[in-house]
C-alpha cells in the first residue's frame, strides 16, 4: 500500500512511537464490551492495539483516503468507519457510556472539545492527545497564567488529569510543539451546574475578553446587577482569580436578574 502523505489542512501528524502508543492504550485500558469511538485514527497507530482489546471500534476519519484504507483493512463487524468531520458528528447518538479517544487535530482542538461537551451525558471518559499548552490551559487552577475560558468551561463539566508529555519526534511529520495526553471524566449528575450552559458561556466569554481588567469593568453593564457580597466575589477581582463554582453562581445571579438570556 502506498505511503500516505500527511495533509496540512487536516492538521495531520501521525503517531509513530510504539512506546507512546503503549502508554496511551494502558491509560485507556480498553476491555471487551466497551463502546469506544476513536477520532482521527490516521494510520491506525492506536486503532490496531485498541482493537486487540475490544469487540468493536468506531472511528471518525475526515480523510477519504484514510477512511478507505481503514475499511479495506478491517472487517465491518470489528470496525465502523464514520467518514466525516468530527465537528459535525452527533456523538450522543453513538450510544451510552461512550469512551472517546484520539490524537485530535491541533487546528480544531478547542472547537472539538466544546462540541463534545454536548454529548458529555452519554460519555464515560475521554482520552486525548493535544498540544501540551492546550492541556495546561484545560487543567489550570484559578490565579494561574493558563487559567481562562477553556479552563472554566471544561472544568464545569469534567474532572481532568494531565497524564504525560509526548515529544515532537514521536510523530511523522513532527509538530512544532510538545504534545500531552489528558484524561477527561464527566462530572456526576449531582454536580453544581448552571441553570443555562449558554448563559455560562456568555458570562465567561465576557469576563475573559479582557482578562486583566477588574471584573466589575469586564462585565460592563451586567456589573450593576451582580450581588457581589452574596456571591463572595470582590468586584475588584479579575476573571482569572474566579473559581469555576463562583462563575456558575455568578451566571445564575445574572440570569435571575434578567441580564443574560438563557
From Swiss-Prot:
Binding site for S-adenosyl-L-methionine: 13, 15, 40, 61, 85, 103
GO molecular function: 16S rRNA (adenine(1518)-N(6)/adenine(1519)-N(6))-dimethyltransferase activity; RNA binding
Catalytic activity from the UniProt record: adenosine(1518)/adenosine(1519) in 16S rRNA + 4 S-adenosyl-L-methionine = N(6)-dimethyladenosine(1518)/N(6)-dimethyladenosine(1519) in 16S rRNA + 4 S-adenosyl-L-homocysteine + 4 H(+)
Compartment(s) of residence: Cytoplasm
Keyword RNA-binding (UniProt): yes
Domain of life where this protein originates: Bacteria
Task performed by this protein: Specifically dimethylates two adjacent adenosines (A1518 and A1519) in the loop of a conserved hairpin near the 3'-end of 16S rRNA in the 30S particle. May play a critical role in biogenesis of 30S subunits.
Assigned protein family: Belongs to the class I-like SAM-binding methyltransferase superfamily. rRNA adenine N(6)-methyltransferase family. RsmA subfamily.
UniProt cross-references to PANTHER family, sorted A to Z: DIMETHYLADENOSINE TRANSFERASE, DIMETHYLADENOSINE TRANSFERASE-RELATED
HAMAP family, A to Z: 16SrRNA_methyltr_A
Record's protein name: Ribosomal RNA small subunit methyltransferase A
Organism listed in the record: Bordetella petrii (strain ATCC BAA-461 / DSM 12804 / CCUG 43448)
Amino acid at each position: 500500500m502506498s505511503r500516505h502523505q500527511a495533509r496540512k489542512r487536516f492538521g495531520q501528524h501521525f503517531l509513530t512511537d510504539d512506546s507512546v502508543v503503549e502508554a496511551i492504550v494502558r491509560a485507556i485500558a480498553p476491555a471487551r464490551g466497551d463502546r469506544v469511538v476513536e477520532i482521527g485514527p490516521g494510520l491506525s497507530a492506536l486503532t490496531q492495539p485498541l482493537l486487540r482489546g475490544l469487540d468493536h471500534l468506531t472511528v471518525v476519519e475526515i480523510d477519504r483516503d484514510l477512511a478507505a484504507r481503514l475499511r479495506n483493512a478491517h472487517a465491518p463487524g470489528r470496525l465502523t468507519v464514520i467518514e466525516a468531520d468530527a465537528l459535525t458528528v452527533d456523538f450522543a447518538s453513538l450510544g451510552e457510556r461512550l469512551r472517546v479517544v484520539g490524537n485530535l487535530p491541533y487546528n480544531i482542538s478547542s472547537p472539538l472539545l466544546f462540541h463534545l461537551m454536548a454529548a458529555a451525558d452519554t460519555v464515560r471518559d475521554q482520552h486525548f492527545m493535544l498540544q501540551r499548552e492546550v492541556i495546561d490551559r484545560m487543567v489550570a487552577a484559578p490565579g494561574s497564567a493558563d487559567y481562562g475560558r477553556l479552563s472554566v468551561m471544561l472544568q464545569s463539566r469534567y474532572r481532568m488529569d494531565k497524564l504525560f508529555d509526548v515529544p515532537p519526534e514521536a510523530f511523522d511529520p513532527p509538530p512544532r510543539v510538545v504534545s500531552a495526553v489528558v484524561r477527561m471524566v464527566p462530572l456526576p449528575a449531582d454536580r453544581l451546574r448552571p441553570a443555562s450552559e449558554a448563559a455560562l458561556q456568555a458570562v465567561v466569554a465576557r469576563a475573559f475578553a479582557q482578562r486583566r481588567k477588574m471584573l466589575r469593568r469586564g462585565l460592563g453593564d451586567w456589573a450593576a446587577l451582580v450581588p457581589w457580597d452574596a456571591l463572595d466575589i470582590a468586584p475588584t477581582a479579575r476573571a482569572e482569580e474566579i473559581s469555576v463554582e463562583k462563575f456558575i453562581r455568578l451566571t445564575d445571579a445574572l440570569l435571575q436578574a434578567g441580564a443574560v438570556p438563557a
